[in-house]
Design a protein with these regions (language model features):
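Accessory interaction regions appended to the cores of large information-processing enzymes
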Residues: 1-171
Length: 171
């Protein structure tokens, strides 16, 4: 739950948002689960508009957030002091605070790879791939060639093709 509060002199807005992960590729989904008795429908619609109008950035790398459901669960307005821009600030603050509370984890990017090499270089390749923390499987021999498929951390495999070319002499 992220809570955003905006209350400078003669302004007031408070927004409570629930942030939930969605399956990969689902995009961002916004909805309201807030009672009209608690917050007027026009303010709820305004908050949903503010959520949709901006590309929100994550707190770890500043990358755009994806595949998340953001639900308005509560909000507060003041009859005399609330204006539309107040909810914009409170909404953005609620998203940011919710992301900070979410205990986000930065996932390491991985490459998928296929390596087809001669039998004589297999032990060197397997040694390298294990040292680079790769997961792989070895396919059947094909005319003195071995087919290795797997994946591993980008930071370890960035320049690995140069190593393969060097120890196989380009074969």
């Amino acid at each position: 739950i992220g809570v955003g509060h905006f209350e400078p002199l003669r302004h007031y807005a408070e927004v409570h948002l629930k942030l939930e992960p969605l399956p990969r590729g689902k995009g961002l989904v916004f909805e309201s689960n807030c009672s009209n008795d608690e917050l007027a429908l026009n303010w709820q619609n305004l908050i949903l508009t503010h959520l949709k109008e901006k590309q929100h950035k994550g707190v770890l790398t500043g990358s755009p957030i994806t595949d998340m459901k953001i639900t308005l669960v509560a909000g507060k307005a003041h009859l005399k002091h609330t204006e539309g821009g107040d909810f914009r600030q409170a909404t953005y603050r609620a998203v940011r605070q919710g992301l900070k509370e979410a205990q986000c984890v930065l996932l390491e990017p991985y490459y998928s790879f296929e390596l087809i090499i001669e039998n004589q270089y297999v032990s060197k390749a397997l040694f390298d791939l294990e040292n680079k923390h790769c997961a792989f499987k070895i396919e059947e021999d094909m005319n003195n060639l071995v087919h290795i498929k797997g994946n591993g951390p980008v930071r370890e495999l960035m320049d690995y093709q140069k190593d393969v070319i060097a120890y196989t002499k380009g074969k």
